[in-house]
Amino acid sequence: MVDVNKFESMRIGIASPQKIRYWSFGEVKKPETINYRTQKPEREGLFDERIFGPQKDWECACGKLKGVFYKNQVCELCGVQVTTAKSRRERMGHIELAAPISHIWYFKGIPSRMGLALDMSPRALEEVIYFASYVVIDPKETDLEKKQLLTEREYREQLLKNGFGSFVAKMGAEAIQDLLNDVDIDKEVSELKEELKTVTGQRRVKIIRRLDVLSAFRKSGNALSWMVLNVLPVIPPDLRPMVQLDGGRFATSDLNDLYRRVINRNNRLKRLMELNAPNIIVQNEKRMLQEAVDTLIDNGRRGRPITGAGNRPLKSLSHMLKGKQGRFRQNLLGKRVDYSGRSVIAVGPTLKMYQCGVPREMAIELFKPFVMAQLVKKELAANIRAAKRKVERQDSDVWDVLETVVKEHPVLLNRAPTLHRLGIQAFEPVLIDGKAIRLHPLACEAYNADFDGDQMAIHLPLSEEAQAEARLLMLAAEHILNPKDGKPVVTPSQDMVLGNYYLTMEEKGREGEGMIFATPEEVEIAMRNGYVHLHTRIGIATKSLNKPWTENQKDKILVTTVGKVIFNSIIPEGMPYLNEPTDVNLTTSTDDRFFMDAGQDIKEVLAGIDTVRPFKKGYLGNIIAEVFKRYRTTATSEYLDRLKNLGYHQSTLAGLTVGIADIPVVEDKHKIIDAAHKRVEQITKQFRRGLITDDERYNAVTGVWRDAKEALEKRLIDEQDLTNPIVMMMDSGARGNISNFSQLAGMRGLMAAPNGKIMELPIISNFREGLSVLEMFFSTHGARKGMTDTALKTADSGYLTRRLVDVAQDVIIREDDCGTDRGLVISDIATGKEMVEPLFERLVGRYTRKSVLHPETGEMIIADDTLISEDVARKIIDAGVKEVTIRSVFTCKTPHGVCKHCYGINLATGDAVEVGEAVGTIAAQSIGEPGTQLTMRTFHTGGVASSSDITQGLPRVQEIFEARNPKGEAIITEVTGTVESIVEDPATRTREITVKGKTDTRSYTVGMADVLMVEEGEFIHRGAPLIQGSIEPKHLLQVRDALSVETYLLGEVQKTYRSQGVEIGDKHIEVMVRQMLRKVRVMDNGSTDILPGTLMDISDFEALNETALLNGEMPATGRPVLMGITKASLETNSFLSAASFQETTRVLTDAAIRGKEDHLLGLKENVIIGKIIPAGTGMFRYRNIEPLADLTNAPEVEEVETETVEN
């Protein structure tokens, strides 16, 4: 028996008739399944035990031989071999077909492989196979052509004319088989290659396609005639089961019906042929057999699908593989697993970062085998069976054992949809009463979970290795940073933010203002006894606070508030005292203006200091990031728990509530509204007089109401009272934003109609005043549209993620350094005046490609091939450097992956990336996960300036990654040179731009409404846009090189995401874009044996040319091809990965013809065949580590081992 997990690769091919017979354990001759009286399988039927194996383990059909003793013996009564019933899942049968039958995949697929092999049109093939025409196989001496089609009538005429036997013509798949047998592949290939040198146009394309198929057959060793079946395999019966329902009826797999149709027709055909029936009857039966086999292989591919009960099309063999419910996606890529459960989640505010609460009755079921083993070990149960009974009875000792078993055994919690890797994290279980899983409040953001009825699944890692990995790599306390941008993902929210905001507020003139304390303990006593308030401004001796003071701050008195003393008491030692929400205070030290000498009057000092704003949500995130940067995970997760507890405690003490009286009233709201009404009347009058168009009127009216809403909003912000609880919630970032506030206190404003257009009638009321019936009706439109948009967007975004993961799943960090000499020059990404992504963010965590010098002094800031830290990046920016050359994924030479230096740091840990990290999947998740936050709409820019629609949001991201022609396309120049002239032509409402290059001059026509990006006399490089809009990347690739296209696409994706406030690290987009440009199309094959027009991986192409050059031959030339992610996924080298993605039958047909070998480099292929994935700890270099023998203790170790075995 081969070891299932040891093979290197997997090959697929076309099965020869001999192979099918070799697989088979016997011929299925009858369409019968089960005898309805005895409930036993019929002999020679579809469930025959003699062919497929016994239904019960170690027992023959008649019951004569029972037990393992008779292993592998064949019963002489019933002829059944004694073996396990599992063999019914493995043993195949076969049907000997009475006539050859064509395989529908090879005849009907696009392009028709049979047609290309024979140089016949698919239509001609169809006529022959389905007995509509004869095809000439051997014309002999007649004037007929080989492969010429003859109708029944022409055939008879030719027979009369030339005599019987003067030529050979046949019908059906038999004819096709004869023709396929006649093809001499080697001869055809050499003839076609000769012809290829001279022809052009359509004929050339046709020849290349034929050559492709023929050379595929030649290389793979498949015979052309195997595309026609003489023997049909029958799959094992347990894969097409038949089960009895209560009531004596049977439910059966559709395949059994399909097989029965084939067997019935095959048997009838045999009988007709034995009887020498008239030719027409036999032909009809053959055609019906052909159709039956077609239906079995792929129902509905040709003609109308065969339906079963209730007009449902039957599921054929092809449908078993296809789609979400097919074998690949349903059973191979995702399986249901044991040792799992699910329940509703509730908040666990008392838990530590690394803990979760697991209900006892869930835990007892999950940990059952562990508990049973412990019971036996502790001699609380005699054997496993007794232990099992004990657990089922839930005896009292079971619970104590459970406590010990659960200790330090991490569990995995997963919330669907799992959009990124933080959707599954490990926690240490804490047993609780009740039935809900308890989740740590800070883990919510990563899971995107809330407690309004969300459910979560729980899984148990079983083996020691799995537990170790869960503990070391997946523990929730380790996941402080978000892999997409390297920012903290566990920032406090809601109550925690509110409590800390309230704690750090300052108020002038609160009780006890100006008191000076010696120690923090004194402050606390004073507060407890009501001498001071949390917000009171006080002084405290710096020497009592264990903080890194500067020299001139020591032995002074710090002016701060009571709350801030408490807030700073939980911050790790070594961090500065935080007295104001500034970056300087956080990274270096507290500002000197907050310090006074012991003799000074504190009242005077306080009068000179303005009140400081409290700490909001964003600043808390900065503090966490700084703590992480200094102390890494353990200290950060401890600090987070302290911050959480403090926040909850203080918000409870603060007791903030909201009532209708807390919503402020804008006194002169009616004035603003009246002014708006007047302005709208003026606009309407202008329109009536014909001074403005209807579009202009519409834009002006909506503009007026927008301005009115903004004016009210501005008033609310200017007049807001910072002690108002609603304002506090909003200002702190705990809940709500200015738009919610302005709808409560200002006006609701304009609403969208069902068609997405904005209605001119605004909602003037706010929620405090209450809406009128009409206003309420209008708001329902917008609300309903919002809901549908969200639902559609989620599906779209999920599908985008699936395609992204598929195209990048085999990108893994495979080596330390690829040694490339190329790099990527980067600078700020900006659109016009607006900064999209500053250079600083693009530098941090990357390696340099060239050393960076100070522009003025010329001294070296950082050497070549060195990691850029935040501090160095800050130095580079401060020196005024505008461009830096860095190592980039785009220029990495590692085949099938990336190297450490081209990738840089792993954003999730802040350290250098490890070999084995699955960066492709992480990149795909980082781009897909925020997809739901992008808008669905394609924005209309409004106004007259630019009339074209510019796609934005999710549709734009899809457009970029699918490499489609963009809407609102920008015209680009194809030459480098100077803009000579821009001439307007009022008659045609166009402008002509002339660009003069060194060798030639080009002219481009653009519309009057287009916004120009160039001016006369400007020097531009080829590929530069002349007008505003999106460049078509495929056109850019023709004009410039691949790197320019990659850089452009990177910038475009960043613009789309950043405009919506989503930050994503460059490297993730680089990984995805590189996958779109992995292929080269061969233009001229030189002296290599590759076909022109072939798509090849860049690394394979370069290796091929290297070999050619070493042998002194002509290398091939090719041009890079830009593919959309769907196309790129289907063109991957792994047929398993492509088949499980989309177009399963097409991918498998093609792979079978080529005899493709899958080297199992990616993640998907290995998941499908059940091998450990070649990433992370499953990587080859980590799995084959032999422990070094320590020879000094060798004998003792052996003894210990034998003892454990005996135990």
Swiss-Prot record:
Zn(2+) 1 binds at residues 60, 62, 75, 78. Pfam families: RNA_pol_Rpb1_1 (PF04997), RNA_pol_Rpb1_2 (PF00623), RNA_pol_Rpb1_3 (PF04983), RNA_pol_Rpb1_4 (PF05000), RNA_pol_Rpb1_5 (PF04998). Its cofactor is Mg(2+); Zn(2+). It comes from the Bacteria. Its EC number is 2.7.7.6. It is an enzyme of class 2 (transferase). One of its GO terms (biological process) is DNA-templated transcription. GO terms for molecular function: DNA binding; DNA-directed RNA polymerase activity; magnesium ion binding; zinc ion binding. It catalyses: RNA(n) + a ribonucleoside 5'-triphosphate = RNA(n+1) + diphosphate. Binds 1 Mg(2+) ion per subunit. The keyword Acyltransferase does not apply. Zn(2+) 2 binds at residues 818, 892, 899, 902. Mg(2+) binds at residues 450, 452, 454. NCBIfam families: rpoC_TIGR. Belongs to the RNA polymerase beta' chain family. DNA-dependent RNA polymerase catalyzes the transcription of DNA into RNA using the four ribonucleoside triphosphates as substrates. This is DNA-directed RNA polymerase subunit beta'.
